Amino acid sequence: MRTLTVDLDDRSYPIFIGSGIRQQKALFDDAIHGKQVMIVTNETIAPLYLESMVSMLSVDYKVDTCILPDGEVYKTLETYGMIMSALLEAKHNRTTTVIALGGGVVGDMAGFAAATYQRGVPFIQVPTTLLSQVDSSVGGKTGVNHPLGKNMIGAFYQPQAVIIDTETLQSLPQRELSAGMAEVIKYGLICDVPFFDWLEQEMPELMALDNDKISEAIYRSCLAKANVVAQDEREGGIRAILNLGHTFGHAIETEMGYGNWLHGEAVAAGSMLAIDLSWRMGNLTEQDICRTVALFQAANLPVLPPAEMTVECFVERMALDKKVLDGSLRLVLLGALGDAIVTSDFPMEDFNSCLLDALEASKQASLA
């Protein structure tokens, strides 16, 4: 088992990474407050892992469960209300601990419920998808979607611990594994060129879920995110670099309908748009572009946006991005490979031509 810490002074917490560790009760005992536990999961994960976790924790705690429908389309205030109702109906008090057992949607909603139930109760993240293990479970972002925009309703609220069991990846559909790999690749692009180089060499074994290699990828991803979050918990500055590809990507997810494009797929296509724009601004070489395209494709990820979208769709959706400041759109771009920047200083001509060219290439590809 490997351990690292998200250093946030009195709100610091550990991240545990290992195979089979969801069954190590001591990890939970150290993070549970009081004697009540609410496990929030979904209909896909419940048959796989819920019974064993309830059995393990019921020895010392009153354990209740809340099983949600599965999918990004259910990341709504209505589903969040199901968690609140479950807590109230089972008479959970302020000393209860919420456990999020599932992927990013479960973690975001359970975390938001914990942040707001009786003005805040502790929670533990037990992420079961690669995307949630390397990204959404770490850093304290919680919330739900709105029809007009992704993650528009939420809170910053840190967990007591993140328990990453790599064994759960064995049940992950290939498409979900690829989606998670988009966030892994992102860390190499924004801040860690040696990691990017390593991913180029190891991607076939990572996609085959070699345990040592996937554990290393998760550890290095979490370490990169923990270092950024420790510097800027609430995204007032450097933390925004973690959103490479997300401004374009969220526009894709919202426009195409939540769940039709997985988050990681949208991030991959969005990252390529950001990288193309960075290249047009003279920050990257053609070799950088080719290497990045090849790496995303090795992970079975899209490198072009949906052919159905238009420049106008992107502009309208991106205007609601949380990084917009005083009416100006700010993008996460690359100053160089491994060096992300957040800027509103980009030529609109390059921005428009980047989108137009990518959309045209996507249309041509769809006709081929």
Curated annotation (Swiss-Prot):
The keyword Acetylation does not apply. GO terms for molecular function: 3-dehydroquinate synthase activity; metal ion binding; nucleotide binding. It comes from the Bacteria. GO terms for cellular component: cytoplasm. NAD(+) binds at residues 70-75, 104-108, 128-129, 141, 150. Binds 1 divalent metal cation per subunit. Can use either Co(2+) or Zn(2+). Keywords: Amino-acid biosynthesis, Aromatic amino acid biosynthesis, Cobalt, Cytoplasm, Lyase, Metal-binding, NAD, Nucleotide-binding, Zinc. Pfam families: DHQ_synthase (PF01761), DHQS_C (PF24621). CDD domains: DHQS. It is found in: Cytoplasm. Its cofactor is Co(2+); Zn(2+); NAD(+). Its EC number is 4.2.3.4. Zn(2+) binds at residues 183, 246, 263. PANTHER family: 3-DEHYDROQUINATE SYNTHASE (PTHR43622), 3-DEHYDROQUINATE SYNTHASE, CHLOROPLASTIC (PTHR43622:SF7). Catalyzes the conversion of 3-deoxy-D-arabino-heptulosonate 7-phosphate (DAHP) to dehydroquinate (DHQ). This is 3-dehydroquinate synthase. It comes from Marinomonas sp. (strain MWYL1).
